């Protein structure tokens, strides 16, 4: 049974990442991100960022360690872009995505990522674009996907972290 979203269409792709999720990813992967590839001025996690108007699918990525929380309505082109930036341009990319094993983009992650960290026991309370507050309206589980240059094909590592542990560790930053 599919869970229907109650999010207004105008906000569907605009929810921001809580800081503690971003900090956890930096800590877990031992990365200091220098580019936020899908952001707006009011919600970027890094000084260097790409806006929707600049279009991360075509823009030059001026960073080596890239954070990406893409629009969830159509993640496939963003997954493909992250893979190509990693393979062709020597970028390390961490994506925050829904867990949906029935999709082509999920299969692309499994085939190309170095590691996938599944977030368990709850769902990320993303930041509502209108209110700036964490929301409990997220209807799908999430995962962190790490793409690294020269990661050997078929070397995927799967890891798990509870949302509670992620928040606890991420808030220490």
Swiss-Prot record:
- Report the record's Gene Ontology biological process terms: DNA restriction-modification system; methylation; symbiont-mediated evasion of host restriction-modification system; symbiont-mediated suppression of host innate immune response
Q: What role does this protein play?
A: Methyltransferase that methylates adenine residues in the ssDNA and dsDNA sequence 5'-GATC-3'. May prevent degradation of viral DNA by the host restriction-modification antiviral defense system.
EC number annotated for this UniProt entry = 2.1.1.72
> What would be an example GO MF term here?
site-specific DNA-methyltransferase (adenine-specific) activity
Family under the similarity heading: Belongs to the N(4)/N(6)-methyltransferase family.
Q: Which UniProt keywords apply?
A: Host-virus interaction, Inhibition of host innate immune response by virus, Methyltransferase, Restriction-modification system evasion by virus, S-adenosyl-L-methionine, Transferase, Viral immunoevasion
EC class (word): transferase
What is the name listed in the Swiss-Prot or TrEMBL entry for this protein? DNA N-6-adenine-methyltransferase
Q: Which reaction does it catalyse?
A: a 2'-deoxyadenosine in DNA + S-adenosyl-L-methionine = an N(6)-methyl-2'-deoxyadenosine in DNA + S-adenosyl-L-homocysteine + H(+)
């Amino acid at each position: 049974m599919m869970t229907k979203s109650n999010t207004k269409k105008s906000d569907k792709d605009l929810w921001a990442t809580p800081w503690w999720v971003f900090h956890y990813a930096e800590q877990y992967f031992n990365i200091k991100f220098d580019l936020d590839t899908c952001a707006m001025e009011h919600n970027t996690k890094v000084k260097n960022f790409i806006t929707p108007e600049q279009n991360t699918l075509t823009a030059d990525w001026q960073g080596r360690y890239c954070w990406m929380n893409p629009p969830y309505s159509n993640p496939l082109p963003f997954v493909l872009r992250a893979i190509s930036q990693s393979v062709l341009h020597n970028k390390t990319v961490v994506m925050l995505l829904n867990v949906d094993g029935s999709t082509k983009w999920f299969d692309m992650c499994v085939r190309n990522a170095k590691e996938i960290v599944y977030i368990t026991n709850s769902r990320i309370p993303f930041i509502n674009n209108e209110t700036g507050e964490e929301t409990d309206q997220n209807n799908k589980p999430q995962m962190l996907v790490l793409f690294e240059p020269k990661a050997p094909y078929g070397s995927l590592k799967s890891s798990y972290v509870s949302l509670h542990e992620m928040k606890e560790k991420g808030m220490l930053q």
